Amino acid sequence: MAVMNVNPTRMELTNLKRKLSTARRGHKLLKDKRDELMRRFLDLVKENKALRIRVEEGIKQANVNMEIARSAMNDKSLSVAMMLPTQEMSLDSSEKNVMSVMIPVFDVQYKTADKNDIYSYGTAFTSAELDNAVSALSEIMPDMLRLAEIEKSCQLLAGEIEKTRRRVNALEHVMIPQYEETIKYISMKLDENERSTTTRLMKVKDMMLEQAHHYDDPFGM
């Protein structure tokens, strides 16, 4: 790891030690965040798998019932039956914060008095299979909305996990080792300078003692 281009001074050493301490704390916090994001992501993936199976099965069953109803009814009767739905709804979209990631939240608001009133037709000229198809689609609507929430949330969490992973790796493999190597280098340089200064002082001391000895004995006796 390359040493940073800094002056090997005690002030710089203190500054780098402070930065290293901050980097280590940041590294731990980011690792904890990454691990928690992964845990939540995997929980959502598990829920997504179960929901998708349920939704696909519900749509499949609704399609089967609709085909049976279409074969039992003429096209005009089927079109009239489905023309004017009695149930109205609106979709409210909001967001919630999960580990600094804003994920979507969908909420259905029913505008009719009875949200279970899903049939827009009378039963005199329709088949039971049409009732079953409409009922199946109505039942899976909440699951479809939740599935949309989860899939978008997984996409957003995956992006944040990757971004956090890159930051963790940058700290772990680049910044922290570089700080450590630079601190080691500066400490070594300061030790060398201190030893060099001590050696020079010892030489000066010896010279001064030798000169003092000559002054005390000017005749060399």
Regions found by a protein language model. Name each.
Residues 1-221:
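Charge-rich amphipathic alpha-helical interaction elements
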